Structure formats: structure tokens, C-alpha cells
Curated annotation (Swiss-Prot):
GO terms for biological process: proteolysis. It is an enzyme of class 3 (hydrolase). Its EC number is 3.4.11.9. It catalyses: Release of any N-terminal amino acid, including proline, that is linked to proline, even from a dipeptide or tripeptide. Mn(2+) 1 binds at residues 422, 520, 534. One of its GO terms (molecular function) is metalloaminopeptidase activity. It comes from Sordaria macrospora (strain ATCC MYA-333 / DSM 997 / K(L3346) / K-hell). This is Probable Xaa-Pro aminopeptidase P. InterPro entries: Creatin/AminoP/Spt16_N (IPR029149), Creatinase/aminopeptidase-like (IPR036005), Creatinase_N (IPR000587), Pept_M24 (IPR000994), Pept_M24B (IPR033740), Peptidase_M24_C (IPR032416), Peptidase_M24B_aminopep-P_CS (IPR001131), X-Pro_aminopeptidase_P (IPR050422). Belongs to the peptidase M24B family. Catalyzes the removal of a penultimate prolyl residue from the N-termini of peptides.
Length: 614
């Protein structure tokens, strides 16, 4: 649905003129660099009408541009009104939003941004680019201008309860995690680490919340020094159990709004050191805000680092890994029941079900499983051409009826107390064409190739990406998204710093035993269909005949327990090794589903058919 943004842009431009700003940048993120945000922080969506999770809006006094990546080209072209120009990031000869902004700044123009919504590295590079192109520079505008346009209709900030995640699920206490973090401070000779990422704070203190839909996090900051820890959070959200737990771990509670006041105290303390002493250094994540770096005293006193908390969080302990395995079995049972039910509804009962009605039923089946908390993201329930919109979101009351004679793509996930799931399966309830079967099988071959890969410790996801694409590449085909992302343990479904893809950030982060990430190659034909096959996998050490360079070798243990669509597989394109892999995988699924469908003949028959040997 397209939103008319004419009045909103006019109001924003009026505020820009009042503040001597010629160009205003509106990022997607909140002040914690969250990928998924709460409604009151959806500023880019409000000003542009584009609701995808990634993108940046740039507004001049007479133009407006929205930059997003290949996952959202289709969606953005449908949602943006005539006021906006779409910058298709990654395509040849298309400028990035930074390049477009710098070009527009020529002639001494000032570019403004809310400094809490941009990292120091991006801000500093943008400032340099603006000046190179003849602009006056990047200005920190402390009042968010979109918030002022939004006014009283802006949703309130959530204040959901915060609860303790016990050792049964976390596997490691907050006191031990704080000790490990302090060792990192000592190594880096830093006085404190100011924590701004919400999932890092939740993990560090073994707490969870519900301030951002689908993400069990809560609005907070933290400061950890060698002998103290302070959690900045609205205290009314904390139960007595949480307060006691924090006290036992030596953590002081302060209001969320006190963070910047206390960073000024730290900055003043750092400035008071004598010239003969080494300057006091504070650590922040390389995803922390420009505002936070400025508040701590700027370049002299702040080191931006890949967060040691993020690195530790990405390597799950044995309790977390076992939880991930178990919740994927329960999640698999819900999905298998759903796909059997959906086929029966569409084929046997000739029911007319729309995409949202189907997704609601999947959520119902998931909610029947133990330790279920909620979904981990909006279910992508997509029929036919909607599947080609990579992050499609069916709208209640305005979505398509599922066509049994078209490809159906379902990308969904859940939050359980013992883990987070994310799985995509592509199905056909009628008779697929030879071209559809070929496309599906090429994607499946890529999934198998990556799942069975063995690689030396120290290998990054950047280096592995081509394994999943190679079969598509042989036919001149590809997909415009990463092949894999890290996944949290009852935390965010997208978790850094690891991933599989061509992002430069992945080059410097090797995969390590205990990582959990997705393997999800795909193929999309605009206006026709989308195919994606996604499993979650644990990185683990594997035994090899040799260990060149005395390095251990790693591989994947896939934990998703859902079969692949039998009728979409072209067996003639599979090698015997790939058939053996499928047979082993299907046998494992059957074994893990024992007892889940007793008395449910419909689901049992579907499972036996879809997992029959090749």
C-alpha cells in the first residue's frame, strides 16, 4: 500500500530550513542500532512509506531518495509514492545513499542527522565525502526532526516487563559473563565498556523483555568497569526477582535516561588525567552511536571495537546448543503438521485460504509446543509472485488467496525459552513445471553443498558463500541476499557478527565451533515465484584424516527438522551423494518426530510420503 508523503515531507522541509539544514538523513535503525525496531522508532517508514527492515531515506529541500538492497527492490517500488526516487543499492551505476547525499551537498550545503542513529565510522566517512564534494559537512541535529513532524500521533515507547532467563536455559551466569568481559577490558587497557546493543545487554545479564516485537529485548544501556556494573533501565519494568538477581551480581540499577549524564561524568574524568599519563580509554561497540562517542569525549578517549560481548554471545555454550536442538524438533513438528494441514485444506477440501489465515494456523500449531513464547519475525506466507518479494509481509485483509497450482514459500520462526528458530520451505500443491523443479533443485543442491562443507578453522562465511550459489551460477542465475546469518539463543533471529555472504564485515569474522547460523540459498523470478530453502546449523569440529597446518577442521550440524518438497525435486539433477544426504536427513527427521503425531493419520501420512527414500 502506498502512503501519500507530500504533507510529511513539506513539514520536514520547513523544520530543516528553520535549523539551516539543506539535506536530512533518516536511517532505519534506532539509537541502539537495532535491525528490528519498535513502532515509535520507525521514522524512515513514517517519512517514506517504505516498511522494509533495511534502507535509508535522504530528503533535500526539493528531492527525496530511498536506498535499499535487493531484498526490497520489489517492495519499495510498490510502496514509495511519486515524491520518492528509489536507489537500488548494489546495482551497477547506482549510487549508495552516502554517494547520493555527498553529490547533493555540492555548493556548501549542510547535511543533518540525529547523531544517535548513525555510527561514528559512518558519520566520519560521510562528513569527509560531503566536504570532498563541496558540502559544508555533517551536522549533529540533536532534536529528531521526523519525531517533530510525527508529533502526538507517534506511538509511545513500550515498557514491557523484564524477566530472568534461568540457568536451565542460559547455561552461564551473569557473574561469570561479567568476569569474562572484565578480562577483555584488561587486555585492551580500557577503563569501561559502554554497552548499547539491546541483545548484548539481555545476554550479558541473562534477562529478557518484549519491547521490540519478536525480539526478547528491552530498552537499556549498561556500563561495565573493572569493579562495577550499571544497568540503565526503567526500574518499573523489573520484578523483585530481577532486582535481587542484579544485586547479587553486583549490578546497580539507574534510570534509562541517566546514561548520557553519566557518560559526561566519564568524559570529564578522562579529560582530568594529566598530560604525562596515558589517556583514559573507553570501549564502545563499532555499532554504537556517534552521539555516544561524542558524549564520552570523542576520538582521544573512545575505541570502537567489534564487541567482545557480541563475539562471546555468538559462540553458544552446551546448554544453549542443546536447547537449540530441542526447540527445532518441536518447531519441526509444528511445521510438518502445518504443511500437512495446508495441503489437505487446499487440495482435498478445496478451501479458499489467504496467506494470513494460513500463517495464523501455523502460529496456532507452534503455540501448542512447550516453552513457546512467540514468533521470531513476521511469517512470510507467500503464494506465486509474492514469493519473489524476498521479505514479503502479507497484510491482513489485503493479501492473496493461496493458489494450489503455484509455488508457496513459507519463511517463519519462533521464540522458545530454550532457543530461536528460523526455517524456510518452498512447496507446490499441484503439478510444478519442469522449470520450477529445476530451479528448486539447484537451490537444494546449494543448500546440501554448504551443509556438507568441511573447512579449516579460521575460515569466514565470506569464503563459503560461493558453495551455495555455484549450481545457480552455472546457469547464469543468482539471488540478491546473503546465504546465512547468525541466530540468537532466545534472542534476535538475526545476530552478528557472523554470517555467510559477500558483506565485507564477514571477511574478518571466522566461523567458530558453537556458532549457530542459517543456510538459505534461494532463487526468485519477479512476477512469477520465489524459492528459498533455509535450515539452521551449528558449527562444530569434524574429524578429518589429516589436519594441514595443525588446524582443526569444521563443518555444520543442521538442526532444522522439516522435509523438503518431494514433488519439486528433479532427481535427474541430483548426484548419488546428494540423494544419500537427503535419505539420511529424512531418516533423522522421522526419528525425531516419533511420538509427535500419534493418532494424527493425516500428518503421519504426509511425513512418510515426503521422507520416503530416494
Amino acid at each position: 500500500m502506498t502512503v501519500n508523503t507530500t504533507d510529511r515531507l513539506a513539514a520536514l522541509r520547513s523544520l530543516m530550513k528553520e535549523r539551516s539544514v539543506d539535506i536530512y538523513v533518516v536511517p532505519s535503525e534506532d539509537s541502539h542500532a537495532s535491525e528490528y525496531i519498535t513502532d515509535c522508532d520507525a521514522r524512515r517508514t513514517f517519512i517514506s512509506g517504505f516498511s522494509g527492515s533495511a534502507g535509508t531515506a535522504v530528503v533535500t529541500l526539493d528531492k527525496a531518495a530511498l536506498a535499499t538492497d535487493g531484498r526490497y527492490f520489489n517492495q519499495a517500488s510498490k510502496q514509495l509514492d511519486e515524491n520518492w526516487h528509489l536507489l537500488k543499492t548494489g546495482l551497477q551505476d547506482v549510487p549508495t545513499w552516502q554517494e547520493w547525499t555527498a553529490d547533493e551537498s555540492a555548493g556548501g550545503k549542510t547535511v543533518g542527522i540525529d547523531p544517535t542513529l548513525i555510527s561514528p565510522a559512518v558519520a566520519e566517512k560521510l562528513n569527509g565525502d560531503i566536504k570532498k564534494h563541496g558540502g559544508s559537512g555533517l551536522k549533529a541535529v540533536t532534536e529528531n526532526l521526523v519525531d517533530l513532524v510525527w508529533g502526538e500521533s507517534r506511538p509511545p515507547r513500550p515498557s514491557e516487563p523484564v524477566f530472568l532467563l534461568g540457568a536451565k536455559y542460559a547455561g552461564k551466569g551473569a557473574a561469570e559473563k561479567l568476569t569474562d568481559l572484565r578480562k577483555e577490558l584488561e587486555k585492551k587497557k580500557a577503563a569501561a565498556f559502554v554497552v548499547s546493543m539491546l541483545d548484548e545487554i539481555a545476554w550479558l545479564f541473562n534477562l529478557r523483555g518484549n519491547d521490540i516485537t519478536y525480539n526478547p529485548v528491552f530498552f537499556s544501556y549498561a556500563i561495565v568497569t573493572k569493579d562495577s556494573a550499571t544497568l540503565y533501565v526503567d526500574e518499573s519494568k523489573l520484578t523483585d526477582e530481577v532486582k535481587q538477581y542484579l544485586a547479587e551480581n553486583g549490578t546497580e540499577i539507574k534510570p534509562y535516561t541517566d546514561l548520557f549524564k553519566d557518560t559526561e561524568v566519564l568524559a570529564n574524568a578522562a579529560k582530568s588525567t594529566s598530560e604525562s599519563e596515558k589517556p583514559t580509554k573507553y570501549l564502545v561497540s563499532n555499532k554504537a552511536s556517534w552521539a555516544l562517542k561524542l558524549a564520552l569525549g570523542g576520538e582521544k578517549h573512545v575505541d570502537e571495537v567489534r564487541s567482545p560481548i557480541g563475539d562471546a554471545k555468538a559462540i553458544k555454550n552446551e546448554t544453549e546448543l542443546e536447547g537449540m536442538r530441542k526447540c527445532h524438533i518441536r518447531d519441526g513438528a509444528a511445521l510438518i503438521k502445518y504443511f500437512a494441514w495446508l495441503e489437505d485444506q487446499l487440495v482435498n477440501k478445496k478451501a479458499k485460504l489467504n496467506e494470513v489465515e494460513a500463517a495464523d494456523q501455523l502460529e496456532k500449531f507452534r503455540s501448542e509446543q512447550s516453552d513457546f513464547v512467540g514468533l521470531s519475525f513476521d511469517t512470510i506466507s507467500s503464494t506465486g509472485p509474492n514469493g519473489a518479494i524476498i521479505h514479503y509481509k502479507p497484510e491482513r485483509g489485503a493479501c492473496s488467496v493461496i493458489d494450489p497450482n503455484a509455488i508457496y514459500l513459507c519463511d517463519s520462526g519462533a521464540q522458545f525459552y530454550d532457543g530461536t528458530t528460523d526455517v524456510t520451505r518452498t512447496l507446490h500443491f499441484g503439478q510444478p513445471t519442469a522449470a520450477e523443479k529445476k530451479s528448486y533443485t539447484l537451490v537444494l543442491k546449494g543448500n546440501i553443498a554448504l551443509d556438507t562443507a568441511v573447512f579449516p578453522k579460521g575460515t569466514s562465511g565470506f569464503a563459503l558463500d560461493a558453495l551455495a550459489r555455484q549450481f545457480l551460477w552455472k546457469y547464469g542465475l543468482d539471488y540478491r541476499h546473503g546465504t546465512g546469518h547468525g541466530v540468537g539463543s532466545f534472542l534476535n533471529v538475526h545476530e552478528g557478527p557472523i554470517g555467510i555472504g559477500t558483506r565485507k564485515a564477514y571477511i574478518d569474522v571466522p566461523l567458530a565451533p558453537g556458532n549457530v547460523l542459517s543456510i538459505e540459498p534461494g532463487y526468485y523470478e519477479d512476477g512469477n515465484y520465489g524459492i528459498r530453502i533455509e535450515n539452521l546449523a551449528i558449527v562444530r569440529e569434524v574429524k578429518t584424516e589429516h589436519q594441514f597446518g595443525d588446524k582443526p577442521y569444521l563443518g555444520f550440524e543442521h538442526i532444522t527438522m522439516v522435509p523438503y518438497c518431494r514433488k519439486l525435486i528433479d532427481e535427474s539433477l541430483l548426484t548419488q551423494e546428494e540423494k544419500d544426504w537427503l535419505n539420511k536427513s529424512n531418516e533423522e527427521i522421522r526419528k525425531n518426530m516419533a511420538g509427535y503425531f500419534d493418532g494424527d493419520q493425516l500428518t503421519t501420512d504426509w511425513l512418510l510420503r515426503e521422507t520416503s527414500p530416494f
